[in-house]
Curated annotation (Swiss-Prot):
Chain positions of site Influences the redox potential of the prosthetic heme and FAD groups: 84, 393
Site (Involved in heme-bound ligand stabilization and O-O bond activation): 29
Catalytic activity: 2 nitric oxide + NADPH + 2 O2 = 2 nitrate + NADP(+) + H(+); 2 nitric oxide + NADH + 2 O2 = 2 nitrate + NAD(+) + H(+)
Protein name: Flavohemoprotein
Pfam families found in the cross-reference section: FAD_binding_6, Globin, NAD_binding_1
Binding locations of NADP(+): 273-278
InterPro entries: Cbr1-like_FAD-bd_dom, FAD-bd_FR_type, FNR_nucleotide-bd, Globin, Globin-like_sf, Globin/Proto, Hmp, OxRdtase_FAD/NAD-bd
Details of cofactor binding: Binds 1 heme b (iron(II)-protoporphyrin IX) group per subunit. Binds 1 FAD per subunit.
Residues reported to bind FAD: 188, 204-207, 394-397
Keyword NADP belongs to the record: yes
UniProt record similarity statement: Belongs to the globin family. Two-domain flavohemoproteins subfamily.
GO molecular function: FAD binding; heme binding; metal ion binding; nitric oxide dioxygenase NAD(P)H activity; oxygen binding; oxygen carrier activity
Length: 402
């Protein structure tokens, strides 16, 4: 239990964190990786280089300081981060290392006096305990469910399928021949990649793109081509070098962006690009469980060349009365224009969306590039969709949609 004095001191640093939060977290990671380079085997190097991880941590530290007197408010965020930590294999023994480096960064960047550092040290201990407790439960649950396991388990690529010019699916079965644990549609796994010539292991999270209950997991990976940045190292390696018969270490499914199976409301699934992957899991699950809920499936892509799983979704639309699928192309090819194989050219806009969704009293799920998600979030808000019915997933560190 933190004293009133400690709470007061921590809350007094909120303006400082608002101003210098990213500077502090940037310095924190510099200290962390220089003194503990082995942790580079856990963290996503690309997110570090792009500053996304630093921003995400700054947001989390700011929220912790703001609500240090009522941490229940940020428990949903703690759980969301906890899922990511569990999937990466972050353990209780890592937290003291992080705490020491964070306090050093606060001192170096902000010149914080000992009184502030001591208060933050106490506060960090309480916050770390919350993470450790929640993550311990997650590890326990993942390991003890049927077909479950702890940390990483070797999976064999039994099938590799090209879904579009940029997206390829990998079907994964356990090397040990055992069962795979079930998951909730929308969840992801971490895949561990060791690239020849690279010093450190690369970990990447990929949404499971098929319904649970199979003998395999399916991930569908976009080959990331850099614009003013290098190409995606891991996605290109998977596309170009990983073949059927190869082995990949995989963590048990995790994540809190999940389909609400208890709701009876209609479902609207909106995706941009590779954001289609968790939506495919949700759509396939609703079909396989014989759900009678109306499903509106809206996908945005450049054109048919980059549009993954188009034929599968169209087949479900044709076969099931409750499924309606719509496609939006921002750069249709001449063939697309000739064949008229899409519903709208340009972006997903409120006026068009309003004509195809069954009702605003529905559960809305969306995923895609950050700019796309900000646009969809604003559009749904403008249409009057209740916040509790809006669900979304970031590929990478969480960011603000405001």
């Amino acid at each position: 239990m933190l004293s009133e004095k400690t709470i007061e001191i921590v809350k007094s640093t909120v303006p400082l964190l608002q101003e210098k939060g990213v500077e502090i977290t940037t310095r924190f990671y510099e200290i962390l990786f220089s003194e503990h380079p082995e942790l580079l085997n856990i963290f996503n190097h690309t997110n570090q280089k792009k500053g996304r991880q630093q921003q995400a941590l700054a947001n989390a530290v700011y929220a912790a300081a703001t609500y240090i007197d009522n941490l229940e408010v940020i428990i949903p965020v703690v759980k969301q981060i906890g899922h990511k930590h569990r999937s990466l294999g972050i353990k209780a023994e890592h937290y003291p290392i992080v705490g020491t480096c964070l306090l050093r960064a606060i001192k170096e960047v902000a010149g914080a006096p000992d009184e502030v550092l001591n208060a933050w040290g106490e506060a960090y201990g309480v916050i770390a305990d919350a993470f450790i407790s929640i993550e311990a439960e997650m590890y326990e649950e993942a390991a003890h469910k049927e077909g479950g396991w702890k940390d990483f388990r070797n999976f064999v690529v039994v099938k590799k399928v090209k879904e579009s010019d940029v997206i390829t699916s990998f079907y994964l079965k356990p090397e040990d021949g055992g069962k795979v644990s079930s998951f909730i549609p929308g969840q992801y796994v971490t895949v561990q990649i060791n690239i020849e010539g690279e010093t450190y292991t690369h970990n990447r999270q990929y949404s499971l793109s098929d319904a649970p209950g199979k003998e395999y997991y399916r991930i569908s990976v976009k080959k990331e081509k850099g614009v003013d940045t290098p190409d995606g190292k891991v996605s290109n390696y998977l596309h170009d070098h990983v073949k059927e018969g190869d082995m990949l270490p995989v963590s048990a499914p995790a994540g809190d962006f999940v389909l609400n199976m208890d709701s009876t409301l209609p479902v609207v699934l909106i995706s941009g690009g590779v954001g289609i992957t968790p939506m495919m899991s949700m759509l396939n699950t609703l079909i396989e469980q014989d759900s009678k809920r109306n499903v509106c499936f809206v996908h945005a892509a450049l054109n048919s060349n980059t549009h993954a799983m188009k034929e599968h979704v169209e087949a479900l639309d044709n076969e099931y009365e409750q499924v309606k699928a719509y496609t939006c192309y921002s750069a249709p090819t001449e063939k697309d224009l000739e064949m008229k194989n899409f519903d709208k050219e340009g972006l997903i806009e409120a006026e068009w969306l309003q004509t195809i969704i069954p009702t605003t009293e529905a559960e809305f799920y969306f995923c895609g590039p950050v700019a796309f998600m900000k646009h969809i979030n604003a559009t749904l808000t403008d249409l009057g969709v209740k916040q509790e019915h809006i669900h979304y997933e970031f590929f990478g560190p969480a960011a603000s949609l405001q």
